[in-house]
């Protein structure tokens, strides 16, 4: 297994633009009440930087490794979803929801179905049912079904990410753990969005949502480097 220190040395510099773009978003903190193409650009910029992070490994890397390709495609849908959510009060919330639904399908595909780990799947199904039941009484119209489907998709994505971390069998890698933590943070971010939009105002909701969201996307993107072997990193040292 590649050492975390080795990977940080090799991958860290490629993530510098992402960290800078994230800082720009939080420093500018553009008001959500005045949506614009500029605010959409600033919000999407960290995700664009994650595109660059994956592309920095080479186009051949993306083309030849299915999981990296799926994650890259998921980031594209995520950026489009982010742009739609800038204008959510103008009727584009559902559009953003659909884009992120596609992103979760792609991430699930990237994480794969092995090991299956039905026990973790059952736990995720139980937890997602609880979360949806908390939202259900506040939902109406098509959102009753849309939120149910979205909850199922993100729970499935989280299941596949968590299932990859086999701590008890000592078969885990730091990149699988990265995907696991990223998926859980994505659930936290999206559940906060749902509670804040449909139930009641959540204190510091935007900070919680965006901090967990950007961290989740970064960790999921980092999991793509699982495709690289130890020799690749030795060449970079």
Describe every region a protein language model picked out.
Residues 1-237:
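Polytopic alpha-helical membrane-helix bundles and their juxtamembrane interface segments
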């Amino acid at each position: 297994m590649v050492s975390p220190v080795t990977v940080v040395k090799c991958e860290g510099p490629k993530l510098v633009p992402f960290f800078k773009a994230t800082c720009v978003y939080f420093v500018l903190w553009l008001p959500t009440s005045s949506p614009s193409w500029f605010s959409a650009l600033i919000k999407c910029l960290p995700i664009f930087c994650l595109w660059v992070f994956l592309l920095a490994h080479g186009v051949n890397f993306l083309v030849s490794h299915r999981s990296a390709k799926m994650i890259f495609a998921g980031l594209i849908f995520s950026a489009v979803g982010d742009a739609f959510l800038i204008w959510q009060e103008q009727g584009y919330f559902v559009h953003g929801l659909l884009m992120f639904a596609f992103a979760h399908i792609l991430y699930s595909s990237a994480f794969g179905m092995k090991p299956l780990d039905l026990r973790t799947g059952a736990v995720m199904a139980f937890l997602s049912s609880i979360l949806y039941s908390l939202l259900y009484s506040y939902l109406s119209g098509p959102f009753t079904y849309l939120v149910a489907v979205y909850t199922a998709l993100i729970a499935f994505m989280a299941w596949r990410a968590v299932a990859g971390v086999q701590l008890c069998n000592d078969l885990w890698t730091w990149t699988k753990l990265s995907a696991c933590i990223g998926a859980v943070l994505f659930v936290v971010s999206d559940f906060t969005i749902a509670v804040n939009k449909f139930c009641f105002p959540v204190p510091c909701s935007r900070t919680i949502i965006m901090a967990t969201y950007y961290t989740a996307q970064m960790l999921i993107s980092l999991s793509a480097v699982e495709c690289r072997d130890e020799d690749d990193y030795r060449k970079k040292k």
